[in-house]
Amino acid sequence: MAKEVDYTIKPEATASNINTEDWPLLLKNYDKLMVRTGHFTPIPAGSSPLKRDLKSYINSGVINLDKPSNPSSHEVVAWMKRILRAEKTGHSGTLDPKVTGCLIVCIDRATRLVKSQQGAGKEYVCVIRLHDKIPGGEAQFKRALETLTGALFQRPPLISAVKRQLRIRTIHESKLYEFDNERHLGVFWVSCEAGTYIRTLCVHLGLLLGVGAHMQELRRVRSGAMSENEGMVTLHDVLDAQWLYDNQRDESYLRKVIKPLESLLTTYKRIVVKDSAVNAVCYGAKLMIPGLLRFEAGIELGEEVVLMTTKGEAIAIGIAQMSTVELSTCDHGVVAKVKRCIMERDLYPRRWGLGPVALEKKKLKSSGKLDKYGRANEATPAKWKSEYKDYSAPDGDSSQQAVDVVAKEEASPKEEPSLEANESKMDIDDAQDDEDKKKRKRHEGETPEERAERKRKKKEKKEKKERRKSKQEKDDSDDSD
C-alpha cells in the first residue's frame, strides 16, 4: 500500500528542496513561492482540505454539477440542499431552465465564495438557427462571429428576470465549430464576461448576417475555475453518494463528488500566513508583515489575493496593500486587507496580545496609567507617550489628543451659569408645564370610546394633510418639467 503523503509545510531555516508540483489545490508549486521567512511555530489545529472530517468536508465543499435541462437553477440547488441535508446552498450564476452544463453548487461555508464565482468568466457552446441561407456560407458566418468580440451593447431578452436596461458586456473570444448552410444551423464556442446573454448574441448575429437568427440550444462548458472536464457530476451521482453513506457508511463516493472550496481559488495569487496570525485574520484583522511567510510573484497593489495557511486551507479573500517588490523589501506595514473571510473563527487558537508592547499596555491599564480603552491619561509615563504609536487612531496619536483635552478642561475654570440664563430657562419650563396641564384638562373624563374616536380623527387629519402635501409636490414637479 502506498504511503500517504502529509501535505503540510514545516518550519525550516533554508529554502525547501521538496518538489511540490504534485501537491493538491493551493499547495501546488509551493516551493516556487517567494520566501519572506521560513521560521514559524506550527499550531496543531485545522487540517489539510482533503483530510477534513466528513462533516467539515461537506460543509466547506463545492460540487461541479451538470445541470439537467428543464428545472431552473434555483430548483436544482434546493434539491441539492435537501439531498445533502445542508443548512445553506448557493450557485455560481443562474442558467435558464432549458440550458444545461456547468453549475457550481456551494455548500454552507463555501457559499461565501458565491459572489466571487458569479462574477467570474464563463464559456458556452451554442447551437444557432439562422432563418435563411447566407450567400457567403461558412466564411461569412465566421467573419460575423469575429466582428462580435470585445465590448458589446446588450439588452436582456424579452423574457428575463432582470430589468431590461442597456448594458455593456465583453466577449473575450469565439470559435466556429461547425456550420451547415443547407440546414441553417451553426455551432460555436464563446468565452465571455459574467452576465452576457448568448440569446441576445444570436439575435445580433442574425441581424449582422441580414437573415435573422435565434438560439436553438446552449450548454455552459466552464464557470470560473471549473470546467466540464474537471470532475463534473450529475444529480444522480450526488443522490447515490448520499445513499451509499447513509446505508453502508462508505464516504469515498461523497468525497469524490464534493470538492473542497479551495478548488475554486486556484486561479488567485497566494499569500501564506503564519499559524499564529490565522485567527486574527478570521476576526477581520489586516495581515501585517510579521504574519507573512510566503507570497506569489507578480502581486499588484489592490489585486485580489487568497490568504492561506501552511496546511493549504483558504482563510480569506483579501485585497493586496503592497506589491511583490514591497513585500520582499518592507520590514513593517499592512500586507492585505480582508475582503471576504472564509474560515470559521476560533478554528485556530487566539495568539494576539502576547507581544512585548501588548503585555506592557496591559500592565499599564491594570495599574491605572492608561484608561480602560488603552488611551493615555495624566498618570501615563512620558516614555510610553513618546514611543507608542496607535495605528487605530485616525489622525495622529489619539492618546496624546485625549491627554491634551483633559489638561485643557482642568486648566480652564468652569464658568457658573448667569442669573439671567437661569431665569429665562425657568420661564420656558413653566410655559411648557402650563401647555401640558391645559391639554390634560381638555381630555379629562372622556370614555375609552371617545378617546379612540379622537385618535382616529387625528390620524385621518394627518393622512389628509400628507396626501395634500404629496399632491402639491407632484404638481410642482410636473410644472418644472
UniProtKB/Swiss-Prot annotation:
Record EC number: 5.4.99.-
Biased composition (Basic residues): 454-471
Enzyme class name: isomerase
Residues annotated as signal peptide: none
Keywords on record: DNA-binding, Isomerase, Microtubule, Nucleus, Repeat, Ribonucleoprotein, Ribosome biogenesis, RNA-binding, rRNA processing
Primary localization: nucleus
Basic and acidic residues bias: start-end ranges: 406-428, 443-453
Function in brief: Catalytic subunit of H/ACA small nucleolar ribonucleoprotein (H/ACA snoRNP) complex, which catalyzes pseudouridylation of rRNA. This involves the isomerization of uridine such that the ribose is subsequently attached to C5, instead of the normal N1. Pseudouridine ('psi') residues may serve to stabilize the conformation of rRNAs and play a central role in ribosomal RNA processing. The H/ACA snoRNP complex also mediates pseudouridylation of other types of RNAs. Catalyzes pseudouridylation at position 93 in U2 snRNA.
Protein name in the entry: H/ACA ribonucleoprotein complex subunit CBF5
Organism: Emericella nidulans (strain FGSC A4 / ATCC 38163 / CBS 112.46 / NRRL 194 / M139)
Gene name of this polypeptide: cbf5
